[in-house]
Design a protein with these regions (language model features):
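Active-site glycine-centered loops adjacent to acidic/histidine catalytic or metal-binding residues
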Residues: 23, 87, 136
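CE4/NodB-like, metal-dependent polysaccharide N-deacetylase domain
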Residues: 43-55, 83, 103-139, 174
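A general structural detector for well-ordered alpha-helical segments in enzyme core domains, enriched
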Residues: 35-39, 67-74, 114, 118-121, ...
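Residue-level "edge-of-site" marker
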Residues: 58, 90, 135-136, 161, ...
Length: 209
């Protein structure tokens, strides 16, 4: 049975802030450079690195090497406090196929390799993969979830996908796409970023019970 939005969608305990997650699915478009610059500007205003979880797909990283390098550089400069989330390697998607049969549920998908190849890519760049895995399309099933548990990873969902007009509340895991494919979500996120009273928290804190 397909499962949608399984896993961690909200902080397990009380959290006085939001958790920003930015998905980088494969895309032919330039990434949201202005948005990442706005995150860096927020960091400068706050006097601390802006916490953000970035979900990296292998194909995006390979096709957008300079953009990927710019994110790593923002981390090195102390502008962004990045939690590197695994978002699969190929992130296959077939237009016209229902979501419940699409993404990692497509035939001939080697799920374990989809996970491990992205981990290897991150490590090769000197990055530390986090314990989090975000399913493409937020679509999984019981078999994939069992494999993920065996690999020791935590499935990451979201309860505030901004492009779907889901409103965050304290403890929300906020989802936007930074790959240029969902500009409306980025537009919505800018409203929350402009609020100087809104706290943004590192994703690991969402696991605290």
């Amino acid at each position: 049975h397909p499962v949608e939005n399984a896993g961690l969608t909200h902080a397990r305990g009380a959290a006085e802030g939001f958790f920003l997650t930015v998905d980088m699915c494969p895309s032919s478009k330039p990434f949201e450079a202005g948005f990442f610059a706005a995150l860096a500007a927020r960091a400068a205003r706050d006097g601390r690195a802006m916490p953000v979880a970035i979900s990296i797909s292998g194909y995006w990283a390979l096709d957008h090497a300079a953009e990927f390098a710019s994110l790593i550089e923002r981390q090195r400069l102390g502008q962004l406090d990045i939690t590197w989330v695994n978002h699969s390697y190929a992130h296959r998607y077939v237009r016209g196929v229902p979501d419940r049969e699409n993404f990692l549920l497509l035939p001939h998908t080697d799920f374990e390799q989809e996970v491990l190849r992205t981990e290897q890519l991150l490590i090769a760049r000197g990055l530390t993969p986090s314990v989090f895995f975000r399913f493409p399309g937020l679509v999984s099933n019981e078999r994939l979830m069992a494999t993920l548990r065996r690999l020791g990873l935590v499935p990451l969902g979201a309860d505030a996908w901004l492009a779907k007009l889901q409103k965050p509340r304290p403890g929300s895991i906020v989802l936007v796409h930074g790959n240029g494919n969902e500009p409306f979500g980025i537009h919505e996120a800018r409203h929350y970023l402009a609020d100087a009273t809104q706290r943004w928290l590192p994703l690991n804190e969402a696991l605290a019970g």
